[in-house]
Structures are given as structure tokens and as C-alpha cells.
């Protein structure tokens, strides 16, 4: 199915003990990314993270990273071979494709990407049969803007240009929009099976609506004592905006960017103490030790995971864990941090 179509659719902190990965350099605290992915997992874009089918009549679909892969495989079902461009266990910010990736994209029937600047400039140079930008039609937030529910990343000087916040998939309502865009793209390529894609999308959207209802009932009730939480990086603005919560973050839009100043750790500690926060959220694809350092400075402090759902590890992939399950884990961990009874 190779017709050329392009759509834009839809304090003092003791850190010496962890010098192996958390290093003071010229007065700044720098984290190294956690790299515990095995070689087998790194081949995920062509093997492990591909839906299982062998027929030549299947649509060849590539999604830029995990949540879009998960959305697309639920919509495409057994009529599509869906793979993820970014390998398993890899933090996708600032990732760039290899020559092999580009060839695969050129041969695909459909390339689904997040948009809103998430994939970087390379996305504009990709030529493929059908490019699907899932951010089209969404009112985007700008990184660093508070929208009444986002605090500037703690201790970060306002020296960088404001950037678009790409983390739309973390709002289940906007994720529903992305699924609808993907559904329409499948129908555009395979009109004969439109009812199949509509039915698959409807089932998955029902699951997203259930997650939305769970968040409202479990996190927004009077049983929750807090409305503020501290995420590791600035990924939850859309989520916080949707559910009337306030996100504070240790780092900015990208979890890999910049140095972490010692005084910033003190700021986080002081803010947490002021607001009664005892939970610092780490992430599943970055080194958790900084969050542990901060949590150790807070009375009764602890570290839990708040996943930006940018990827899964190989074990989770093998277990069939997807967006819905990761969001459910986030709800459970937020209930602890927000002190919900």
C-alpha cells in the first residue's frame, strides 16, 4: 500500500556517597542517565516491540515512541504490523534516528508521531507514505508557563526560550484525541475495513475514559489532602491542568537537560516542607538517585515512580504492560503523594 499521502492530522545534602552517578562538578550536581538496557532490548524497533503477524497484506505502521505504538496497535489490531521507532528502555528526549531507521520509515505505510516538537527537527526531513501528527487540533501549552497549575522548575533560571510542551499523551482526554487521529489515518489507508478500526478505537477509548473517571474519583475527592506534587521533569502540565492539580518539577521539559545546582535541591526540600509534601517522584527511564537524595532531606521523605509513559523496559513489554496499566500505576502512586485517604 504505497501511495504518497501526507496528513498533519489529525541545606546541606550529602552526596559524596553516591559519587558514581551523581557528581559534583564546578559546584553543580550532574546526573548520568541510567543505562541498564541490554542489547536485545535495543533492537526493539524492528523486533520485540512489533505486533505479531506475518501476512504481507498487513499495514506496515511505525510509531515514534511507546505510547503511540500502544495506541496504534490497539487500533490496528491484526490488520497492522506496528513497531516503535525508539528502542525499549530508551529515554526518547533528544533521540535521533539512524540511517536504518530512516530506510524503515521510507518503506512504511504509515508513520505516527507525537508532534508538538517532541521528536525534534529530524521529523520534518522524513519522507514516508503517510505521516500522522497526533498533536494537530490540540491547544498546546508552552514549557515554563504555569497555566495556573504549573510551577516553574525549581531553581531554574529563566534564561532559555520558552518551548512548546509536547507531553499531551499524559492527559487521558488528549490521548483520546490522539487515538481518534490514529483511527482516522488507518481508515484513510484501508477504507474497506473502516468499521474494524472504528470498533477497535472505540474499545480503547472506553478504557481511556475509565482512566479519566478514576482520576477524578480518586485524586480529586475531599479525601485527598494535597493538590501539589513534585515530578522529576516538567511532563505533567497537561495532566495537572486537566485535573486542577499543581505540578512542581525538578527539571524542565527534558529530563536530561542541564545541571542541577545544590541550592536547587535545598529549594525543593524547603518547598516540600512548606507544602507538607513527603513524596518526591522519580521516573522509570532515568536515574532515581537524585530523587532519593532530595527525599532523604525531607521529614519522612520517600521516592515513588510517576511515569511520563515515554517507554517501558523489556520485562514490562514482555508482560504486555501498556499505557493503561502505566497510568493506573501513576494514579495509585499519586494517591500516596497527595495523601488521599
Q: How should each PLM-predicted stretch be described?
A:
Residues 2-341:
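Extracytoplasmic metal-acquisition and chelation regions
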Amino acid at each position: 500500500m504505497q501511495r504518497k499521502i501526507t496528513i498533519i492530522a489529525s541545606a546541606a545534602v550529602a552526596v559524596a556517597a553516591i559519587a558514581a552517578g551523581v557528581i559534583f562538578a564546578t559546584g553543580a550536581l550532574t546526573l548520568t542517565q541510567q543505562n541498564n538496557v541490554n542489547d536485545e532490548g535495543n533492537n526493539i524497533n524492528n523486533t520485540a516491540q512489533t505486533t505479531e503477524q506475518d501476512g504481507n497484506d498487513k499495514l506496515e505502521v511505525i510509531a515514534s515512541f511507546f505510547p503511540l505504538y500502544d495506541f496504534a496497535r490497539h487500533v490496528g489490531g491484526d490488520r497492522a504490523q506496528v513497531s516503535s521507532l525508539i528502542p525499549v528502555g530508551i529515554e526518547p528526549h533528544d533521540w535521533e534516528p539512524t540511517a536504518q531507521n530512516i530506510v524503515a520509515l521510507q518503506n512504511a505505510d504509515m508513520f505516527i508521531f507525537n508532534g508538538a516538537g517532541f521528536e525534534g527537527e529530524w521529523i520534518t526531513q522524513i519522507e514516508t507514505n503517510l505521516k500522522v501528527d497526533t498533536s494537530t487540533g490540540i491547544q498546546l501549552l508552552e514549557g515554563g508557563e504555569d497555566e495556573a497549575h504549573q510551577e516553574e522548575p525549581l531553581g531554574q533560571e529563566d534564561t532559555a526560550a520558552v518551548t512548546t510542551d509536547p507531553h499531551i499523551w499524559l492527559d487521558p482526554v488528549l490521548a483520546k484525541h490522539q487515538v481518534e487521529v490514529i483511527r482516522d489515518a488507518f481508515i484513510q489507508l484501508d477504507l474497506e475495513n473502516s468499521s474494524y478500526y472504528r470498533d477497535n478505537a472505540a474499545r480503547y477509548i472506553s478504557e481511556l475514559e475509565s482512566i479519566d473517571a478514576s482520576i477524578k474519583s480518586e485524586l480529586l475527592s475531599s479525601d485527598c489532602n494535597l493538590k501539589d506534587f513534585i515530578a522529576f521533569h516538567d511532563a505533567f502540565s497537561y495532566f495537572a491542568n486537566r485535573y486542577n492539580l499543581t505540578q512542581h518539577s525538578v527539571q524542565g521539559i527534558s529530563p536530561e537537560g542541564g545541571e542541577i545546582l545544590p541550592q536547587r535541591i535545598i529549594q525543593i526540600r524547603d518547598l516540600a516542607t512548606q507544602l507538607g509534601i513527603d513524596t518526591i517522584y522519580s521516573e522509570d527511564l532515568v536515574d532515581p538517585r537524585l530523587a532519593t537524595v532530595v527525599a532523604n532531606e525531607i521529614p519522612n521523605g520517600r521516592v515513588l515512580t510517576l511515569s511520563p509513559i515515554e517507554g517501558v523496559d523489556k520485562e514490562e513489554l514482555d508482560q504486555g504492560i501498556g499505557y493503561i496499566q502505566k497510568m493506573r500505576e501513576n494514579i495509585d502512586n499519586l494517591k500516596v503523594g497527595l495523601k488521599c485517604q
